Design a protein with these regions (language model features):
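Short, positively charged interaction helices/loops
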Residues: 55-88
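Short amphipathic alpha-helix starts
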Residues: 15-32
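Short, basic amphipathic alpha-helical segments that act as recognition/interaction helices
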Residues: 3, 8-11, 28-32, 40-64
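A detector of short terminal or domain-flanking linear segments
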Residues: 1-14, 83-139
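Short, surface-exposed, charged/polar-biased interaction segments
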Residues: 51-55, 66-71, 121, 132, ...
């Protein structure tokens, strides 16, 4: 299984849409900053604010990731990875902060036989059949 560091997130090219509710005054202030040229658009301001807050709490995130043995970034699980686990008699616990992706050539039967649990703080990409097979194992 491959793990990609947080620094590689820009190369991954994967984003998730997030919907937030803001008060009209906050929204107006954001629009004013955009209009005055501080940010190119609303999304630019919101991304910058989120990154700044994540930087403020960066050390806490790193400690939590280390304590919980989470993969930080991208974890891609391929058929070969799962076949090796099956041959070795291992059940995998997938724990990711970022993106967990199960390859499209992985069957529901193989994931049921090899994946004990999936915990993703971020996004989980897998076929509908694989998601259904893991439904009772997704934390």
């Amino acid at each position: 299984m491959a793990a990609v560091s947080l620094e590689a997130r820009a190369r991954i090219g994967e984003t998730e849409k997030l919907t937030i509710n803001l008060g009209v005054v906050d929204l107006g202030q954001i629009d004013l900053l955009v209009q005055e040229g501080f940010y190119s658009n609303r999304t630019d301001l919101i991304r910058t604010a989120i990154r700044n807050q994540l930087a403020v709490h960066g050390e806490e995130v790193r400690r939590s990731v280390a304590r919980r043995t989470l993969v930080l970034g991208l974890q891609h699980v391929g058929r070969a990875d799962l076949e090796r686990a099956l041959s070795a008699g291992h059940m995998l616990q997938i724990q990711v902060v970022g993106l967990a992706r199960i390859a499209s050539d992985v069957s529901p039967e193989l994931v049921r036989a090899t994946i004990q649990s999936v915990e993703v703080l971020g996004a989980f990409h897998a076929s509908t059949a694989v998601r259904n097979a893991l439904a009772d194992r997704i934390l």
